[in-house]
């Protein structure tokens, strides 16, 4: 991932320098604005759905995304773009993993989430083919790349055993803010948008583009899963019983699904009481191997951040520039 971003940044710098050298003379009068809408698909890549790779996420949880976008052409192949969008992402261990693959341990973890993302993005768009004349003379098609900065607001939610959706951040499911636990995470975050696209000239003033952009975020909590399990009694004492329930979902499925229970028993043996000397109960006060046990791995401990992918179409309208009339003597 780091190598990909470095390579993209080098290409970006080279493209900007080329665009700048080509635009030194006379392009200012050809600058123009465009505005439009976008309709996209949105995918999540993280602890609950890592996908084959960050370039090829799983499509099982594809959700919608839509927004408005504006573009200002400043050089023959360079534009500044701003986009406001809304979309959803989703992940579920029970769907993204199964009994036969290497991710069976995520199946046992049995966590899930959904998240709504409100994003404001600014990026630099670099066209492969330059146009140093009026917008009407632009190429019929051109590939492009973009890189920028995004600010987004998110709110991961989980579904309770009763079917209600609750805000996971409010439940501090990994002991955020408690002694020995991680810091509270913010619902407001930054991301680095990087992507590629292809633009087609529909008419003199209309363009249709398709692009794919990865959002490399600075948080590992798009899914509310990042570190280790916290003490269940402490979660209950500070944030209520729902905090404990949403933190560890293994035994919930163990009780309801005989196939799941048999697989867990075969892998780890029967569940053990959460506190030594107590009986095993059917309400989650137990643990299986390290699942649910304080300090046991709950998320990716390698420090990898969550990301999301936005793929879709942009339809934009170009505002005509000023008409310059010839002077008569």
What is the role of each PLM region?
Residues 31, 62-64, 116-120, 141, ...:
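Residues that define the transmembrane beta-barrel architecture of outer-membrane proteins
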Residues 76-78, 84-169:
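Gram-negative (and chloroplast) outer-membrane scaffold detector with strong preference
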